[in-house]
Amino acid sequence: MVPFEYYVALSGLLMVLGFIGVIIRKNIIAMLLSTELMLNAVNIAFVAFDMKLHDVVGQVFVFFILTIAAAEAAIGLGLIIAIYRMKKDVDVEKLTELKG
């Protein structure tokens, strides 16, 4: 069986990679994917601590987070498509105005 610390290290690494992706990327789609990566890192951490503590609460939180992540992805992609139809670009630096 894989040790608990490996799961926590993997979770931390994925969280850092997702955070760097949100900070560095200029494309909204890449930023959305990086956010999803961070949410999955949290899921791995919840399951790892759930294994360590022998409790089911972590798995329940994972189901809630997956539901929220799916809704976030659907709404985010809808907004990105609407922005692309109006501006013909999804680069964050070119999207400076919030009014239509």
Curated annotation (Swiss-Prot):
It holds the Pfam family Oxidored_q2. GO terms for cellular component: NADH dehydrogenase complex; plasma membrane. The chain crosses the membrane at residues 4-24, 28-48, 61-81. It catalyses: a quinone + NADH + 5 H(+)(in) = a quinol + NAD(+) + 4 H(+)(out). The keyword Calcium does not apply. It is found in: Cell inner membrane. Keywords: Cell inner membrane, Cell membrane, Membrane, NAD, Quinone, Translocase, Transmembrane, Transmembrane helix, Transport, Ubiquinone. Belongs to the complex I subunit 4L family. NDH-1 is composed of 14 different subunits. Subunits NuoA, H, J, K, L, M, N constitute the membrane sector of the complex. NDH-1 shuttles electrons from NADH, via FMN and iron-sulfur (Fe-S) centers, to quinones in the respiratory chain. The immediate electron acceptor for the enzyme in this species is believed to be ubiquinone. Couples the redox reaction to proton translocation (for every two electrons transferred, four hydrogen ions are translocated across the cytoplasmic membrane), and thus conserves the redox energy in a proton gradient. NCBIfam families: PRK05715.1-2, PRK05715.1-3, PRK05715.1-5. This is NADH-quinone oxidoreductase subunit K. It comes from Sulfurihydrogenibium sp. (strain YO3AOP1). The gene is nuoK.
